[in-house]
Every structure is written in structure tokens, then in C-alpha cells.
Amino acid sequence: MASPRSVPTPFPARSATGGLAGYAEQFAETEGYLDFARFGPPSRDVLDTTRQLLEQSARADAGTVDELMRQELRARQAAARLLGDVPPAGVALLPNTSTGLFHAAFGLPHGTVLVPAREFPSNAYPWLRAARLGRVQPVSLEPDAYGRVTPELVRQALTPETVAVSLSAVDYRTGYRADLGGIREVIGPDRLLVVDAIQGMGVADLPWTAADLLVTGGQKWLRSGWSTGFLYASPRALERLEPTLTGWTGVVDAGVLDSQEHAPAPDAARFSLTNLSPVTAGAFAAGLELVLRTGVDRIQAHIAERTAQLIDTVRSAGGVVLSPEAEHERAGIVAFTMPRAEPAVVAANLAEQGVTATVRPDQLRLSAHASTTLATVDRVHRALTSLPV
């Protein structure tokens, strides 16, 4: 039973001089919001889809559950289109990035995996837990002096025991974009490349299918809300990874409830543990479809412009930018320090000007999106130039 369409969420329009026209109108975050690397406020489409599906579930009849469950395929199809030439069967939905990384870690029975030092903890704990069970062992890979994990560093660290490399496509601290194509080339066809794409998916044009196992969440740059995400598995990953964590929905003939163990599904469905919420699947589909309609290239270009403006603003105020200099090496993150002020003091000034940023003990992080306005950059300028001398 289809529910009547809800009244669309009334968001304010954005001017063309502010956010990206045709995209920014979907959003209602406050001016000054620069924390997309932590959480991306969802779009009107995501909110409306969530409301519609919940209303549909509230009027449940004999066909409601089956109809709602079709949202899972809709989301997988959208994710496959975003990745490029990928079949939907190569995609499985996830509730978060960590779940996908646990599938990778527990799927490798032996050998070593290179994991960059100072990675986000979600790319550390799965390998540590697997190692304690006697499976694959993590080996720390130290970045260069600029915090980069380059193909040459990876090449030098490879040993005959290395079975995989696991890293973030975009570093959460600095916004550095990993050279996925170069790393894929140096590790060769006999090792797996595991990629956490959460800080770049939908906003950075990277060769995503260089990864054998790619995982991402939808709550940051894809702006689809929490408990959303997907996994892409290449044919090589499906061949090499043991389906250790496969649940009842990840097997052949999952709907046949005969109390027998079924074989794992032949495609990415084998990474399913159980049914996920069709409401969040529909919301995720709506978020992905908005990115597809807008175009990653347009979103990326707007973010690059705002990021460059933020970098200039920080430097003009005497700040030290920790993010990469070259535009092709950075995404939407600007990490910086102010030599004459502690991060907590800078954070207080930013907050006074209505700027939302990530504050860490040793640095601050600004992250702009395609809805970020010039007025937001001006707020940062006022905050940094009014610091006490």
C-alpha cells in the first residue's frame, strides 16, 4: 500500500553566490557549519523519504514489508552507479564503515596487512581483533613527514607475507587524498586493497574500483543520515575473503527456513549479517540519487573553491595549514593551527562567530561542502583575525 506523498520539508533557498545552485537548496544547515567531515546534515529528499517510508509502515498491510524491502535494491543500484561500471550485485548495504572493515579483517585467515599509523580507529580495531584470534596480523606503516601514505612508501613496506593494504582514501586529519591507483599498481594482483572511503565518497573523483573491498558510511559527505553505508567487493575480494561473518541473509536461498546451513551467496550479499532498516535504505538511496543528479564533478569543484578560500583565510590570519598544498592531493578538509593561540581559544572565537568546526587538542579542522557559502568563509576570517595578540 503506497502512502500519500508528504508535504515537502520547507527549506530556505540558497543564492547562486553561496552554495552550489541546484544542490544547496536541499539543505538547511546553519550558516557557519564547517564540520562535514564529522557529520553532514541530511537533505530535504532524505528527510521526506524517511517520513514517507515511516508513514507507509504505519499503515501496514499484507504487502507493506515486501514493498519496503525493495528500498535495499534501490540503494545498491544508486551506489553502483556512483562507483561507475559496477554491477549492483557487487554492492552490499552496511549500517556503518566499521562493519565492512570487520568483514575484511575476519575474512583473511593469515598473512600480514599494512595499516597506516594514526589511521582513524575504525581501521585499526578490526585488524587487532582478528590478530588476537590468530588470523591476519596488522603491520603499522608510518606516513612520510607530511602525513602522506604514498605508493613508494607502500612498495618499500611490502613483504612476501603481505596479503593486503588497508587505508583511508582521504585522511580524516589532513584531507590528504591517497593515490589509490598508484597503490593498486605497486601491490600487484596478489594482494587486496581495502579502502575506507567515508571522507571522500560523493565529493572526490577517485578511482574507487582500484579497491578490492571498499567501505563507506553515508552520514558524512553523502549526507544521508546515520546507519547508512555500503560495501563494494571486487571479484578478487569475493575469491580471497572467507565469509567468516556471513549471517542468515548472506546465504543462498536465505528465504528457505529449513534449519540447514546454506552456502554463502556468490556475490557481495555474502557480507550481509541480517536485514537492515528499509527506512534507512530508502533514505540512503535518496541521498545517493541527489549526488548522482548533481554530479560529483560539480560538487567537487565547489568544495575545492571553498577549501582554497578557507586555506587563504587561515594563512592571511597567520595560521599554519596542515593540509596538502596541491589541490589534487586534498579533499574538503582544512586542518590548521594558530601559533599564537591554543586550539581551545581559537575554537571559542569560531563559535562566537557561529562557526562549527572540529576541535582537537593539537589542531582544528574545517570541512566545507557544496552548500557552504562565502558568508561562512567570512565568519572564519572574523574569528581568526580577532584572536588576542
Regions found by a protein language model. Give the residues of each.
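Pyridoxal 5′-phosphate
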Residues: 1-389
